[in-house]
Amino acid sequence: MKILVLNAGSSSLKFQLFDMEDESVMAKGIVERIGLDKPFLSYSKGTDKIKFDKEEPINHKDALQWVLNTLTSHEYGVITTLQEIGAVGHRVVHGGEEFTGSVLITEEVIEALERNKNLAPLHNPPNLTGIYATKAVLPEVPMVGVFDTAFHATMPERAYLYALPIELYEKYKVRRYGFHGTSHRYVAMEAARRLGKTLSELRIISAHLGNGASVCAIQGGKSIDTSMGFTPLEGLVMGTRSGDLDPAIPIWMMRELGMSFDEVDNLLNKKSGVFGLVRGRSFDMRDIEDWMAAGDEEAKKAMEVYCYRLKKYIGGYAAVMGGVDVLIFTAGVGENSPIVREMVCEGLEFLGIKLDKEKNNSRGDAIISAADSKVVVMSIKTNEELMIARDTYEIVRGLT
């Protein structure tokens, strides 16, 4: 069966087409500048990379049609007809409490997603737009929703409740949800597979470090805690997001600086994190590393704040699990930054975490802990799209 995986953003549509017989990627790419002038499609098939342009603005439905036309085209296609697509898997950021696992998308599911839109106003509306576009263009093809929050549905109350009036949770579902669940689930399963262990016997700490970043405690194969909360703003220091901070600071900014709700929201989500600490020069950790190596004190400070926050979370999660067996670094920074991994692990020998400096200098998939390290430290390339394809395949296969 061939599965098309879609991730719809506000002005983009990412896609991958999988052949589930061997889980190979047949083609992948992204349509960017949806709703704007001069949209373009970046398309990869094997080693071939092609870019297509349009002059006029397009919507998500047009973008999906463009992708499907390319996938079936004589010159660039990898399938002959659209009938070869057995199902479409959608990344949906927020499932709320209603969706604790991946589901077949029905009218009832769409209605529930519409109700939950306000839980993730930046992400869920475009995810829904992608679902509506698929319904219009591929009406006969089953769709599956895979939720970033679902893996964290196993968190106990003590981990997900905020110490706020309980009515806020009961009436409005204000609680910690967590995100990046599909990535944390994938790398945890991959770590267990590579170590020849069952997932249920391992205590795993997974650090997903991209522009957005979160860390997750996994025990008995289940997420028991994670750093992101009601929104993806809580937790670690990120590229442009503040992560944890005193909740009175936004109130102070509005009262003392006269900032509006939108201005505070924009500052915390788009102008903070390492970007804010280096005065808005860059949110790319590669720049921060280069500047730090050149003696830039602000970059050094930003790196220290970034790594210190993650180190605290690792210590905390080791405490709640009574130790740790595997520490995983994943996503852009986690997979490719030896200096971040080194600074985070430095001083954690008391937990049994010891890096091998030479192995740590590798990028991508590797065991990077020393031979005498009690904890296995791994760098694993995440693959959320494959996880979505697998879930979609399992659900749709059960329909026949």
Curated annotation (Swiss-Prot):
Cofactor(s) needed, names only, are: Mg(2+); Mn(2+)
Q: What is this protein called?
A: Acetate kinase
EC number(s) for this protein? 2.7.2.1
One annotated GO molecular function is: ATP binding
Task: Tell me the GO BP annotations in alphabetical order.
Answer: acetate metabolic process; acetyl-CoA biosynthetic process
Work out whether the entry's keyword set contains Transcription. no
Q: Which residues form a coiled coil?
A: none
Keyword set, alphabetical order: ATP-binding, Cytoplasm, Kinase, Magnesium, Metal-binding, Nucleotide-binding, Transferase
Mind telling me which PANTHER family this protein's record contains?
Answer: ACETATE KINASE, ACETATE KINASE-RELATED
User: Could you tell me which pathway this protein works in?
Assistant: Metabolic intermediate biosynthesis; acetyl-CoA biosynthesis; acetyl-CoA from acetate: step 1/2
Taxonomic source organism: Coprothermobacter proteolyticus (strain ATCC 35245 / DSM 5265 / OCM 4 / BT)
Quote the catalytic activity from the record: acetate + ATP = acetyl phosphate + ADP
User: Which InterPro entries does this entry report, sorted A to Z?
Assistant: Ac/propionate_kinase, Aliphatic_acid_kin_short-chain, Aliphatic_acid_kinase_CS, ATPase_NBD
Chain positions recorded as Mg(2+) binding sites: N7, E384
- Give the binding site residues for substrate: R91
Report quaternary structure and partners. Answer: Homodimer.
GO CC terms, sorted: cytoplasm
Give the residues the record marks as binding ATP. K14, H208, L209, G210, N211, G212, D284, M285, R286, G332, V333, G334, E335, N336
